[in-house]
Amino acid sequence: ETTQQMVEQESEELWYQRVQGSYSLLEQRIASAMRAELSAIVSELETVDSVQRELILRSAGRRVAAKIHQAASTTVRSIVRDAYQEARSKADKFLEDPVAKVVNSADSIIAEIVEHDMQYTSATLYDKLSADAVVDLAHVALVARTLSTTIVARLQTETWATMNQLLKDKRRTIKKYWISQRDDKVRDHHQEADGQVVPVDGKFKLRNNAGGIELCDHPGDARLSPANRINCRCVLRPRRG
């Protein structure tokens, strides 16, 4: 490796460690909210008759989704601010504040992501609570990791897209850059995606287990197959166009 390549790699690794803070905070808040609500549901199940039990089980997914939404919403501004600060040096002056613009639309973005995920998670929650009436911590951790990846990457993409719209100098547009965690746990298809750079409104290409190609906006994109989406640890970084 050349000295320049080593410097760039070190810079990228330091950045990765820093941006992981946004993911970790969101993941912890989502997991904590899920554990608390599921524990409350389990406690209720122990004190009711069969009719009430069924009603509680049927509403479990909606209740957990509401708590996830609430937990994620408290972290929105810090995620958007981090995305803005990372891209700021690569952009130019703006016609208005991009952060406020994204934050104003963030609630509907989170609602969309949570609703999509809970379509699949609700059935699993129902089955697990019906069978065991216990909080499955491994399942909670998996949902929290997947959702945090999706939400952070989506808000990053929205932030950079808004920055591009508000740029005074359109020659300095921001692109997005896919980075895997680059360890022995990274999936082969995600390792192949590592280093891809596309326009903010462009699509990344990932191979899937069937040998086909999947297009996505970011890590954790709902368009991806479960094998490419669940428990993904990849991140995005802005690049100057």
Where are these predicted regions, by residue range?
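N-terminal leader/targeting and assembly helices and adjacent pre-domain segments
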Residues: E1-R171, L224, R239-G241
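Acidic, glycine-rich two-metal-ion catalytic cores of nucleic acid-processing enzymes
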Residues: A138-G241
